[in-house]
Amino acid sequence: DLADIFNEMLDRMRSYTELQEQFVEDVSHELRTPVAVIEGHLSMLNRWGKDDPEILAESLEASMQEIKRMKTLVQEMLDLSRAEQVNIHYSNERTNAKEVVHQIVNNFRMIYPEFVFTLDDDLYSEKILKIYRNHFEQILIIVMDNAVKYSTDRKEVHISISTNLKELEIAIQDFGEGIPPEDVSRIFHRFYRVDKARARTKGGNGLGLSIASKLIDSYKGRIFAESSLGKGTIFRIFIPIQNTDEKE
């Protein structure tokens, strides 16, 4: 009857509004780190870099890279907002593993000077990953941002990269709050937060790890967490590598 039709219409409108709100939250979450990188470089230039050509050139180049990444990121977030299942159109894209990992770690060292970021690079040569560079950067930023956010007194993050015959493994370890055992399997669910009150104080909204997980799944990779409550968490990310006998 008319009442049922009206209620159905309201449900559709409510669903659409929720999707729009999710999109705004997604974009806000994902743009925060690149904005911080640009702000850090501009602040450095404002203090002493204007008269140093080397610092000026380096900061401008890094800022331009982040602006370009932000523009691409907005389009990719539009894709994420349109469907729960990410459709990847970059199956032929390849990315240099060492280069990107070192770049992201250096960016975090600049943004969070109070933290110690230790990088153990066990790769003897560059490895080519079967993933779009912007997506790989996005995944690393999400997980490292999470490590920083939930660190406590011990402000350290350990990052290691190694490889087997088929995959690159990135391990990102913090020494913070940790995750209760019953929550570890659910942290990759969209909007899931271990402690909503605590997440609000830290700016968390339960989006980042869900996005990272979807992107990794789309490239036939894996991500999982090992955690000890009160001692910290290790995230392990596995991304397929291109073997030397494979065609570009």
Per-region residue spans from a language model:
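Membrane-proximal HAMP signal-relay module
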Residues: 1-24, 41-50, 61, 82, ...
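Short alpha-helical segment of the dimerization/phosphotransfer core of two-component systems
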Residues: 65-70
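A conserved beta-strand-to-alpha-helix junction within the catalytic ATP-binding
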Residues: 91-109, 116
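Conserved catalytic submotifs in the C-terminal HATPase_c
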Residues: 91-94, 114-127, 131, 165
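Short helix N-cap motif at coil->helix boundaries in the Bergerat
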Residues: 97, 178-189
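Short helix-loop "hinge" at the ATP-lid/N-box region of the Bergerat-fold HATPase_c
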Residues: 147-148
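Short beta-strand/loop element within the Bergerat-fold HATPase_c
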Residues: 154-166
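Acidic ATP/Mg2+-coordinating residue in the GHKL
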Residues: 174
